[in-house]
Swiss-Prot record:
Family in the record: Belongs to the glycosyl hydrolase 13 family. GlgB subfamily.
Recorded metabolic or biological pathway in which this protein acts: Glycan biosynthesis; glycogen biosynthesis
Role summary: Catalyzes the formation of the alpha-1,6-glucosidic linkages in glycogen by scission of a 1,4-alpha-linked oligosaccharide from growing alpha-1,4-glucan chains and the subsequent attachment of the oligosaccharide to the alpha-1,6 position.
SUPFAM superfamilies tied to this protein: (Trans)glycosidases (SSF51445), E set domains (SSF81296), Glycosyl hydrolase domain (SSF51011)
Catalytic center residues: 420, 473
CDD domains in the cross-refs: AmyAc_Glg_BE, E_set_GBE_prok_N
HAMAP family for this protein: GlgB
Record PANTHER family: 1,4-ALPHA-GLUCAN-BRANCHING ENZYME
One GO biological process term: glycogen biosynthetic process
Main enzyme class: transferase
Name of this protein: 1,4-alpha-glucan branching enzyme GlgB
Amino acid sequence: MNAPHKTGTGRRAIPAAVDIDALIRAEHRDPFSILGPHGDGGSGQYVRAYLPAALSVRLLAKDDGRELGEMEMSEVPGFFVGHLEQPQPYLLKVQWAGGEQITEDPYSFGPLLGEMDLYLFAEGNHRDLSSCLGAQVTKVDGVDGVRFAVWAPNARRVSVVGSFNSWDGRRHPMRLRHPTGVWEIFVPRLQPGEVYKYEILGAHGILPLKSDPMALATTLPPDTASKVSAPLQFEWNDQEWLRSRTGRHDVAAPLSIYELHAGSWQMEQHEDGQWRQYNWRELADRLIPYVKELGFTHIELMPIMEHPFGGSWGYQLLAQFAPTARYGSPEDFAAFVDACHRAEIGVILDWVPAHFPTDTHGLAQFDGTALYEYADPKEGFHQDWNTLIYNLGRTEVHGFMLASALHWLKHYHIDGLRVDAVASMLYRDYSRNAGEWVPNRFGGRENIETIDFLRHLNDVVALEAPGTMVIAEESTAWPGVSEPTQQGGLGFNYKWNMGWMHDSLQYMMRDPLHRRHHHSTLTFGLVYAWSERFVLPISHDEVVHGKHSLIDKMPGDRWQKFANLRAYLSFMWTHPGKKLLFMGCEFGQWREWNHDEQLDWYLMQYADHVGVKNLVGDLNRLYRQEKALHQRDADPAGFQWLIGDDQANSVFAYLRWSNDGEPLLVVANMTPVPRLAYRVGAPVSGAWTELLNSDAETYAGSNMGNGGEVNTEDEPAHGMEASLKLNLPPLAVLILKPKKD
């Protein structure tokens, strides 16, 4: 080991002043060209390190730790240079004011990411990006540490900063990999749990510290740092569920979804009156038995990806790959999903590829330019939510969102994604006036980049995560949302039926006296019920912002409100389409949903609230047991009107048919007037069993009905040779089935 010197070749131990100056000012675009080991022009090598605030640096032999000599500090404080007679692996022994550190030199490692990884990323088709970019706990050349990689093609310099380097951007400037614009560095000996951000020098100067778009874990909000997370280490026990879920998600299978917000479903109250949210494991212990008791097949979680503002309910998120720290660690979330699967409950996540918030630590102007968003506000700013719109026409952003979807489906065994705000993605003029939007390349209003992305997403998910579902929240009449991409559709498995939801709620909110004038509002949904594969959604959006809770939408006095609610839920469960119900609706919570408070569980001491809960449980069990209620959802022949035109009495009657030709008869009386001896045609003669009566005493109804069984009469009605004479309870639905011998 010698002091720095000039070799006979003229190579300088100290780099050019312009390079040193750029390094000191943290503006050097290629720190690896200066720092680390470099040949001296002969048989030896120089070792350079820039360690601001270091008191001294010594070189140690990598193999046995023997001291090779002290590096000399140059005229520039913190810039150290040493010389080795022969190239050899070495360690840096750094003396700081607060202690000593021994580590490998981050600038002694060559390029990290493989060319194929970079190619697939640039192409927008990397299927496992969450194991490539971001902070990856890994081993390089036998050394444990963390590899950081971030996409910032227009940055002049990117550094990773954290408590491990005193948040000093001069300590770990990264290597730029041309031409993809990915910056990378390996920090030896760094451990999981370290917090970090990226310090980025843009074209116009230093930007606010940025969180990692590819972070696998984060700190607890309101903190905004990313957290180094080891690859998910969880022993899954859900293999039986995974093998069976393809059949469970088939259009002919029962699909009944309980939508919830993880933080406000149920909480623990401390003695001081403060509320504490449950973590994932605690929530599993309480939620799973409840969902199992009610008979739902799946739960749907409002977005659980990390989001800075809790009041956004998760829909304004910034970490597309990290579960929020509010409810525990990534392993805790995996344990929650695994517990659901072992209880035969599927897990669907709300997923938001449409837009993201403008927080300065997030994706906005990430490298000093509109990187993830459109540059033109007419394309890139969402006026309804004051958010930015993903530029899915950019291949890297396309691939980023595609990888996010696959990350949840594959790494966390998620069973389906509900894609939020699809309508806002499909139309360039969504919620915009004339002159406020940019036409596509053909002059139209369709967002061609989004259409391409959604089709690619659904094709890739079907290939990479078979048996999972992708469900669209799409509120317009866009054709073919759930049609295969090969047939020109978008390729979703299901689409939310927003039209049915709006029409049916409008009907139910009317005074029963006036329903006769709006009879077709309730029947209209059957005109287009088979145009898509539909989910009937009563979601969180319908019980907030002054819309009233589901039961409080219903007209009448207290008894009538409950009767209307029971009738509505029974109508929903017997209507073609899969089911989704938001938490609290299943027992008739009076309050609108508030994300800061738990549901009003105290209401379960009242019989009428318990009655609604009992009804939902029985509807789910009937829905799963009776093939006629789910098997032919996508087949118009599985539904048959008997009475759709009795406006005067506001009575509806229809049949649901199974593949085996077994019928169920549904009769609904949507007025508070009992209809005695009301005749309904029957396709099968003999005794019919009353499977469910929403007015039954067990549901806190008046208990009017038909004694559990009724026989047909040989009097033709409604195109049938036989008929049933039924007593129709007030504001109630009956479900009947032919009695088997």
